Amino acid sequence: MDFITITSSNKTEEFALKQVAKQATSSLMYRLGKTIILASVCVEREPVGEDFLPLVVQFLEKSYAAGKIPGGFVKREGRAQDFEILTSRLIDRTLRPLFPKDYRYPTQITLMVLSHDVENDLQVSALNAASAALFLSHIAPIKSVSACRIARIGNEFIINPNTSLLNQSSLDLFVSGTKESLNMIEMRSLGQQLNALEEPLMLKALELAQKSLKETCTLYEEIFTPHQNELLFKESQGIIFNERLLDLLKNQYFDEIIKGIESSALSERENVFNEIARKISEAHSEFSLKEIELSLEKVKKTEIRCMIIKDKIRPDKRALEEVRPILIESDLLPMAHSSILFTRGQTQSLVVGVLGTDNDAQTHESLEHKAPIKERFMFHYNFPPFCVGEASSIGATSRRELGHGNLAKRALETSIKNKDQVIRLVSEILESNGSSSMASVCAGSLALYASGVEIYDLIAGVAMGMVSEGQDHAILSDISGLEDAEGDMDFKIAGNLEGITAMQMDTKMSGIQLEVLYQALLQAKKAREHILKIMHEAKEKIVINFSHLPTTEIFNVAPDKIVEIIGQGGRVIREIVEKFEVKIDLNKPSGEVKIMGNKERVLKTKEFILNYLHSLDQELEQYAIDEVLEAQVKRIVDFGAFLSLPKGGEGLLRKQNMDRCQVVLKEGDSIKCRVISFNKGKIALDLA
């Protein structure tokens, strides 16, 4: 076993090599404080025939890592939690650009959290563990990467804060990359205020992150290189194209290729290129269909890049900084609390807002919290197949849908003034031609306002792209699906006029330089200003229907009265909810009663509850200690019998009192009893 210790960027990491999981291609035990992660890489020796990178990343949390047993009926880990899926995506998006373009060997990277001490950052630890395991595997010529998190407390940036410091921060910036450039960025604002970060400060934070990554990656390469396995798969020379076929495409089918490029819909574009491939295949049998498709893809990509970089024009004829036409409609769904239809070009998001009570909040188990945590603001993103013209079934929520919903949530969360309010936004993507997550942010912000939710400001989102060729590059505002597919960067940025509340950057290159990112940030600000102007105009036309929105009424009763509102087995509370069609949250320790629903029904419910409690008090006042009564058995329970009293109300005759007198009762019996006490609004009885 080899044991390695590396200290950099405010952390000391320990790596135990060749200790466990030795049948994997490579494996290691990563340790930071009391956080321990097992990282393994497994590679199959036979490549797949399809043209894609068969990489799978799985991040798994074990409950025992925090000394806990899983909640719920089944006491073992089951379906992956949201945090596990989002962390898997985070690692995948960092590592994927590092692989050679022609790498086709099925590869699985598994990260198992075996111990977690709460204070250390699981996502940074997991990515660094995955990077080290992948670098040591030497399955291909892959650079070393690392991750860091940047927080901001006051005016000070902090590298790799612990959980306590991050909870005080107004910024959560996660960055990964090599020693030369950045591969992936996730950012959100934190705190009770909006805390949007201005572009110059964002650049400063990214510079700090890059400095940290350079230090860590340099150490990783120096220390891990002697421990690498033998290189398994050398990078090939790539695809060798038939020049005669390329000339044929450029000379005889160029106009049709341009027509396909300029087709705005994905389904229409695919039909054009499929038809070109079919024609060539029928006319030139010497070329295989696969060869034709690859050559067609190369010509298409070359022409798109030439069009953008040299001619400064995009496939849909827009200028580089031009945003597609925007149309905003509101109040489409009469029964929802709000609904906004946001259309930008051929991308369309219908966001529906619903307000709820504490009982409606989503609960999650987490290694970092002893008790389940409540998610009060939920943003769910759905991408049905018909939005891109595909005929396929709608299945379970995909990783992509979860990730896009999480991004939109992060963009909007700090714009909400009352963080205790329970809100669910659902984005239904009805059409998609790029930037659907950012359309969801725009529609979601307006949906919050239309729901009567107090917000600090409207938030707009825009997806930026980049096309590069050698030393030349072009930044694109509001990218389409084609520009996303053929471009080198997908940089989603959301915020208001003052700054950024969330962003996410992915690249298909080995990394992006800071100066390019800053150019994209400034260009995105212009696009955001344009979109926000249209959103503010739409906001002025929104009429909030307060009579339809749920009202919340909060009042307090004596804590011992809460059990009276609940009733035996929840009978009373169920009857109240069914009768008035409201939602009720009860807090036993404080005696707080929260009612939510239609305003008129809420007020009637409050009146009913107070009158009900008052009537119970009056019933108690009719009886005195040691008073002898003739009562009737109402119902028998395990611990005794409830008796109907002659002047109203009921009392409890406990089982031990019945046993002492050797009395056997059945429902309907009449019996003499004596009042012995009043306990929390209950009358306790004994046999007379």
UniProtKB/Swiss-Prot annotation:
PROSITE patterns: KH_TYPE_1, S1. GO terms for molecular function: 3'-5'-RNA exonuclease activity; magnesium ion binding; polyribonucleotide nucleotidyltransferase activity; RNA binding. InterPro entries: ExoRNase_PH_dom1, ExoRNase_PH_dom2, ExoRNase_PH_dom2_sf, KH_dom, KH_dom_type_1, KH_dom_type_1_sf, NA-bd_OB-fold, PNPase. Its EC number is 2.7.7.8. It is an enzyme of class 2 (transferase). Residues 550-609 form the KH domain. Residues 626-688 form the S1 motif domain. GO terms for cellular component: cytosol. Keywords: Cytoplasm, Magnesium, Metal-binding, Nucleotidyltransferase, RNA-binding, Transferase. Its cofactor is Mg(2+). Mg(2+) binds at D484, D490. It catalyses: RNA(n+1) + phosphate = RNA(n) + a ribonucleoside 5'-diphosphate. It is found in: Cytoplasm. Transmembrane segments: none annotated. One of its GO terms (biological process) is mRNA catabolic process. The keyword Nucleotidyltransferase applies. NCBIfam families: polynuc_phos, PRK11824.1. Belongs to the polyribonucleotide nucleotidyltransferase family. Involved in mRNA degradation. Catalyzes the phosphorolysis of single-stranded polyribonucleotides processively in the 3'- to 5'-direction. This is Polyribonucleotide nucleotidyltransferase. It comes from Helicobacter pylori (strain Shi470). The lineage of its organism: Bacteria, Pseudomonadati, Campylobacterota, Epsilonproteobacteria, Campylobacterales.
